[in-house]
């Protein structure tokens, strides 16, 4: 009888230890929405007097490693060189997702991710002047100063993104991302080209590819917590 009692207590102790280990291997991970701004636009305004812009960014944690993401903003850029002078002003929106490839330890919510954005922009150009060049160096170049407006222009493009977000304080994140952009379509004005697209940046002739960097700060709004197995 004593043997059965001892065996019973040993079994209870083993189950208790196993349950405690299982409990210790589980922690709660925060699910919520992050909202913030792209600081690279503010930095750019300090270094480029002819540029104005602001971008609001956000994401929502849908699954353990999957985040739905959005960006929206406005930009205004004045460009003047030896050939022409023009202004571009418009707004844009980007929608996509990020996938976190980083396995966090307990109480860490950092991200190293790959993602994509499908982007669209609406904008206007104001052509201030342009120069007609002549191969004959004996005559001055013909500069035409005639303001002309090109309205209701548009462009769409795709972005492939590599980046990270680090939780520097509780629910406060700093991030960096590299963007590879591919222009998909655009509505161009008559007798002019889209040399600058808000949200995409400069558009080069016969080249629909662009590159960009973002520096972000975001604040998380916790919605709920979900159990996760400790690594």
Regions found by a protein language model. Name each.
Residues 19-61, 218-229:
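Short glycine/proline- and aromatic-enriched beta-strand/turn motifs that initiate or cap beta-hairpins
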Residues 20-31, 65, 103-111, 168-174, ...:
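Short loop/turn motifs that connect adjacent beta-strands in outer-membrane beta-barrel proteins
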Residues 31, 50-54, 89-93, 110, ...:
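Residues that define the transmembrane beta-barrel architecture of outer-membrane proteins
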Residues 33-37, 68-70, 93-95, 110-116, ...:
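Transmembrane beta-strands of outer-membrane beta-barrel proteins
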Residues 39-43, 72-78, 99-101, 118-124, ...:
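Transmembrane beta-strands of outer-membrane beta-barrel pores
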Residues 45, 73, 77-90, 123-134, ...:
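Extracellular/periplasm-exposed beta-strand and loop segments of Gram-negative cell-envelope proteins
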Residues 46-103:
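Glycine- and aromatic-enriched membrane insertion/assembly motifs of diderm outer-membrane
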Residues 94, 98, 208-231:
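Outer-membrane beta-barrel "beta-signal"
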């Amino acid at each position: 009888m004593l043997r059965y009692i001892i065996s019973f207590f040993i079994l209870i102790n083993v189950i208790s230890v196993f349950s405690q280990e299982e409990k210790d291997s589980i922690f709660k991970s925060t699910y919520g929405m992050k909202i913030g701004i792209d600081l690279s636009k503010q930095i750019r305004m300090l270094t480029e007097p002819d540029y104005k812009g602001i971008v609001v960014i956000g994401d929502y944690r849908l699954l353990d490693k999957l985040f739905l993401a959005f960006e929206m903003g406005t930009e205004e850029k004045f460009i003047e060189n030896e050939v022409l002078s023009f202004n571009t002003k418009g707004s844009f929106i980007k929608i996509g997702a990020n996938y976190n490839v980083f396995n966090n330890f307990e109480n860490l919510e950092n991200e190293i991710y790959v993602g994509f954005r499908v982007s669209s922009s609406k904008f206007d150009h104001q052509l201030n002047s342009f120069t007609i060049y002549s191969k004959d160096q004996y005559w001055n170049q013909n500069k035409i100063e005639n303001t002309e407006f090109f309205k209701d222009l548009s462009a769409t493009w795709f972005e492939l993104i590599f980046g990270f977000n680090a939780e520097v304080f509780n629910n406060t994140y700093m991030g960096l991302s590299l963007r590879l952009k591919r222009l998909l379509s655009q509505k161009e004005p008559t007798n002019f080209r889209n040399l600058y697209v808000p949200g995409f940046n400069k558009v080069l002739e016969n080249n629909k590819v662009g590159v960009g960097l973002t520096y972000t700060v975001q604040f998380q709004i916790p919605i709920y917590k979900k159990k996760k197995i400790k690594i």
